[in-house]
Amino acid sequence: TAPVPACFLCLLALSSACYIQNCPRGGKRSYPDTAVRQCIPCGPGNRGNCFGPNICCGEDLGCYVGTPETLRCVEETYLPSPCEAGGKPCSSGGRCAAPGVCCSDDTCVVDSSCLDEDSERRRVTPEQNMTQMDGSASDLLLRLMHMANRQQQSKHQFY
């Protein structure tokens, strides 16, 4: 009968272990005294920053979502301290990621509050952007982005 209590104690010790060791109670964003650091750099030439496990954005790059440029962003999930990417807070709980783009950790949306005064006056050099669109082309692109975002979200829903 002595092995039964010993086995019970071993099972109890194993079952009360903490399996996720790098996250505090409440998640990694609940660190009260930890300074917020800049998120991992990503994208071509590491000129962007991770906004989520599949999102990499930069001022000059725009945003990459679910592309090979975002593979490094998965590492952010395993780091114990919280990070903050981007500029000022914007819609849907996100932060300004690129001119006119607001990203949270799982999605990006077009947001005019992320346009600074200089971005309207700033000229884009041909090396930075090979195409300039008129209003109707940019409206079409915006609609396509919204459709792709809705399709991506519907893939992750379970019925």
Curated annotation (Swiss-Prot):
GO terms of molecular function: neurohypophyseal hormone activity
Location of the protein in the cell: Secreted
Keyword set, alphabetical order: Amidation, Cleavage on pair of basic residues, Disulfide bond, Glycoprotein, Hormone, Secreted, Signal
Disulfide pairings: C18-C23, C39-C83, C42-C56, C50-C73, C57-C63, C90-C102, C96-C114, C103-C108
Signal peptide per UniProt: 1-17
Glycosylation sites recorded in the entry for this protein: N129
Post-translational modification note: Seven disulfide bonds are present in neurophysin.
One GO location term (cellular component): extracellular space
UniProt modified residues of type Glycine amide: G26
Primary location: secreted
UniProt name for this protein: Vasotocin-neurophysin VT
